[in-house]
Design a protein with these regions (language model features):
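A short, glycine/Asx- and small/polar-enriched loop/turn
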Residues: 1, 43-50, 100, 183-187
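Glycine/charged-rich beta-loop-alpha catalytic/anionic-binding loops adjacent to active sites
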Residues: 2-4, 195-196
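Helical element adjacent to the flavin cofactor pocket in flavoenzyme catalytic cores
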Residues: 5-62
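Active-site substrate-recognition segment that forms the wall
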Residues: 57, 67-196
Length: 196
């Protein structure tokens, strides 16, 4: 019986450095960033869109909606086909580098209805971690960790055989954190042009 996914060609990146590198590449290729500019509403026009912001209006022929947790807000301003995004909070446990190399790849359990499950992996700096959990939450800004969820993660880490062949040393946990990801109610990534 299969209990985990193996992706031999998978890799690990630093999400912060990757985002900076992508931004630098975009800038070198002509993208003009509008920092500290908040879009308050979008109007559909005959030839495109008008984006109303705190720094004035912008006209454009196309919009790429990459608003993450708030993608539904902007989508629903211009489309009759409404969507709803739920914030799905994930919590992580990070271990000290002294935990060492438990294995040389990311291990992911078989996906369930709440997502890919709690993975075991490394950062590019060599810290081992487990997570994320998956809890649907109302507060899209709420990035606090919870004792109940962290206790469940610790229980998994201390058990023999959850993604590793031996229990993980809980005295080597150095931090925990949480993040939220966008989950569309129909369980789909939406990568397409609006139909209307």
């Amino acid at each position: 019986t299969a209990t985990a996914l193996w992706a031999p060609t998978g890799g690990i990146v630093c999400p912060f450095n990757l985002a900076i590198a992508a931004g630098e590449n975009a800038s070198m290729n002509g993208v003009e960033f509008q920092f500290e500019t908040e879009a308050s509403s979008i109007e559909k026009t005959k030839d495109g869109y008008i984006i109303h912001t705190n720094k004035g209006d912008m006209e454009t022929k196309a919009i790429v909606n990459a608003a993450g947790l708030y993608a539904d807000v902007f989508h629903n301003m211009v489309s009759e086909n409404k969507i709803h995004i739920t914030a799905r909070k994930g919590e992580y446990l990070f271990f000290d580098k002294s935990v060492g190399t438990i294995f040389n790849t990311t291990v992911v359990p078989l996906p369930g209805k709440m997502g890919k499950g709690i993975a075991a992996s490394y950062t590019i700096n060599g810290n081992f971690f487990i997570g994320p959990t998956a809890t649907d939450v109302e507060d899209k800004e709420g990035l606090n960790t919870t004792a109940e969820i962290l206790d469940k993660l610790k229980e998994m880490a201390a058990s023999d055989g959850y993604l590793t062949r031996f229990p993980l040393p809980l005295n080597k946990v150095i931090t925990s954190f949480a993040g939220a990801r966008a989950h569309e109610d129909h369980h789909e990534f939406i990568v397409q042009e609006l139909e209307d």
